[in-house]
Amino acid sequence: MKHNRSIFILAAALLVGNTAVAQDKIAVKYGNYITKEDAYKHLSVLASDEYEGRETGKPGAWKAAEYISAQFKSLGLIAPVNGSYLQKVPLVEIAPGNSTLKVGNTSFTNFKDFYTSSSKVDFTKSISEVVFVGYGIEDEKFNELAGLDLKGKVVLYSTEKEPFVNGKSIITGTEKASSWNSAKRLRNLQSKGPALIISFNPDLESNLKRMASYLQTGRLILDKPNQPAQASVITVSKAVADAILAKTKSSITSLTAAIASTGKPASKAVKTGVQTSVLSKVSNVKADNVMGLVEGTDLKDEIVVVSGHYDHIGLTTEGTDKVNNGADDDGSGTTGVLEMAQAFTKAKAEGHGPRRSILFLAVCGEEKGLLGSEWYSESPIFPLEKTVTNLNIDMIGRVDPKHKDNPDYVYLIGSDKLSSDLHKISEYTNATYTRLTIDYKYNDPNDPERIYYRSDHYNFAKHGIPIIFYFNGVHEDYHKPSDEVSKINFEMLAKRTRLVFFTAWDIANRDKAPVVDVKNDFPADR
């Protein structure tokens, strides 16, 4: 069913409450301070080769944090972290050590037959029994963990796609897969407290060819106080998995195929003979979120957060261009945050400051797993119960293939998932000020790209805070050195930023904050 967009926007304008239908001339005045020329100035610095791709924990990211802090200071933003613009994010890097794996009398080779994702705690042990849990799914319609106590056990599961019977998922009952992808299964298994997880990946060989250098480098995790160390994970080939299961007289793929054909779990303890040593090298990592505050007036205790991640993926060893500059991802969003900070501080200086306070938040660690925003959401500088909205900007400087003939667009994700008020405000501000084509393709919970889970707004939404994610879509230079400043459409970067500005202006100045009144149809667990 198609919506009549004109009627919908008119209805939204009538329903949003105390905001006038006509343009707010004061808002327009300060929105016009967001320019393509200023955007170019900031992005040319942040996405320069000097910043070496801004990888979290590396000198380029530290330089970016210093630049953003200096901009906030020059604008006169309040430094909200005990007089600083920097919030330390406690990260550690866990790099794989010289791990070994032997099953029976056969020794297997690291980064050929298996690879490890290590924990902060080394694991060296002889294993006489593993608990085979099939696909590792724990769903009310298909529960392979029912009745199992996995705490302290060694668990073996397959990362193969969930079982389908007669072309239909045994979980959804349709041709569409459930949310139980391999990452969700692993997180759920980790929550059960096993001593070690052995993960069979049928694509191990191709993954090693494609990602060998990445898999041999360290991964970053939050070093949360009082958090128990997660189990190490050994990802193994079919040959290794079959050797572990040798006493069952069955291969791992025949066992999972039997589960798929019957639609019934077949979890069981299996006797085996495994000797393994999973070793790691742990080191502390320097990383910071950067934030500055424009304090509100009569509603200053309520906070609107405008965010973007300033980190990217750093350097590459391949090709002649070694720097993944990340001009669009997410230099463009960080630039948008800086531009809006300038516009709001100019308004405040001239007596038109916002009623609610606005926190401009540039986070680190997004490319490592949304780590900076996760830390902020769990250790907030301002109470989450007083945080009324998060407007998150991640990639707003390019045009994707779908819109090559109409660049005047932006994807919006999440505006209607927690608050009907926020969605109406968003529709109204666009219709009144920027008139971009709003594309809601990625707002569908069934969209396979799962964009909703892939940027920092997620860590606010999971705490029940209404969010909007602004995004230009994926393009051919995504996560490549060719994501350069020269390819940015600065006219569109500025226009999309103005949409976020006008939305923030409305939220910050209205009598009542957006009410949480919608049950989110995106599952909470990504």
Predicted regions and their residues:
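His/Asp/Glu-rich mid-to-C-terminal helical/loop segments that flank catalytic regions of hydrolases
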Residues: 335, 342, 475-526
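Second-shell loop/turn segments in exported
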Residues: 25-33, 49-59, 74, 87, ...
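A conserved hydrophobic secondary-structure block that centers on an alpha-helix together
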Residues: 134-210
